[in-house]
Amino acid sequence: MFHPRARTMLLLSLPALIIGVASSLVLIAAMKVASVFQQFLWQRLPTNIGIAYDSPFWIVGMLTLTGVVVGLIIRYSPGHAGPDPAIEPLISMPVSPSALPGLLLALIIGLAGGVSLGPEHPIMTINIALAAAFGSRLFPRITALDWTILASAGTIGALFGTPVAAALIFSQTLSGSNDIPMWDRLFAPLMAAAAGSLTTSLFFHPHFSLPIAHYTQMRLVDIASGAIVAAIAIAAGMVAVWCLPRLHELLHRLKNPVLILGIGGFILGILGVIGGPLTLFKGLDEMQQMAFSQTLGAGDYFTLAVVKLAALVIAAASGFRGGRIFPAVFIGAALGLMLHAHVEAVPAAITVSCAILGLVLVVTRDGWLSLFMAAVVVPDTNLLPLLCIVMLPAWLLLAGKPLLAANRHEP
């Protein structure tokens, strides 16, 4: 009844569905545990002790302790809590399963303790390793590369609550040929992403969109304004690109993860005191609080953006286990709100979306993901043509530039 091509796609459907659901469940479990632990550390415990959770003493002490604990996990756990996210790309080949318990624990403690990183890199590493380990036993004919693709697609769908991001990302990597069309190659990853996003939606829905005034009509001056905003965001991001490898090398001369992460946590605490609680944690909930605030002005948004960018660099350079996409979105939103407050003639929809596009592009060097993040934070169809046009000069600015990554050091 089905063409051989269709049968091949159907054979991959079951593994794709399983991987997508499992990828989402791993993410949900980690986020739920981290959320409960965060509430204990930042609400119940300081209340019981009689200390304000936003007091300098508590912020510095909690982040320093978080760094020390994560450092102990990295030093003494099997596999040293997986690869350093500052060195490895978001999607890479499977790591040893023995490293996963330490990696998961380091992620949860970092998220709960207020470290300015998201869950995407460790969750991606965990899901890829689990998929390759169990999948190769259940379906030995499927290669490790295929398991990597399915797990990463399922994780992307789960993280962003939609399979669209996975479809965009893998459409540029899984190019078709005369024998195998692109959509044949996309079928299984897209199914994994759909399963991951649907499973996530049963428990919670990632809320990215901000309450920003509707953008009515594109004008030529708006294109120029958007390009300038994106260029400013890229310039800010390139400061982080310059700082990260140098700071990473400087800190890792100490050799001891406990000392490195303890110092990193202490610096994060100092930054948290300067920027306030909004600059802590992964940034999505804090971005909503920032956008809904009626008291913040241009100077406040600037402080939030600078402190969060510095915290992102410190956290990544120290070796905390976490991703950089979610904090980059927060930084872009803060930068965009600051620019709109300075020049109110430029709509906030343009400043926020184009700043996010520029920052995420620096962090990921993925045009589709950058467009996607800008579009979901400011969900306005009138903006899509403008964002696509603004992407062109932004991509030119970053062509051939170094990535936001540290260099691998000899032990």
Swiss-Prot record:
Its main location: membrane. The keyword Ion transport applies. GO terms for cellular component: plasma membrane. Coiled coil: none annotated. Belongs to the chloride channel (TC 2.A.49) family. The chain crosses the membrane at residues 9-29, 54-74, 99-119, 149-169, 186-206, 223-243, 258-278, 296-316, 322-342, 343-363, 386-406. It comes from the Bacteria. It comes from Salmonella choleraesuis (strain SC-B67). Keywords: Cell membrane, Ion channel, Ion transport, Membrane, Transmembrane, Transmembrane helix, Transport. SUPFAM superfamilies: Clc chloride channel. GO terms for molecular function: chloride transmembrane transporter activity; monoatomic ion channel activity. It is found in: Cell membrane. It is a multi-pass membrane protein. This is Putative ion-transport protein YfeO.
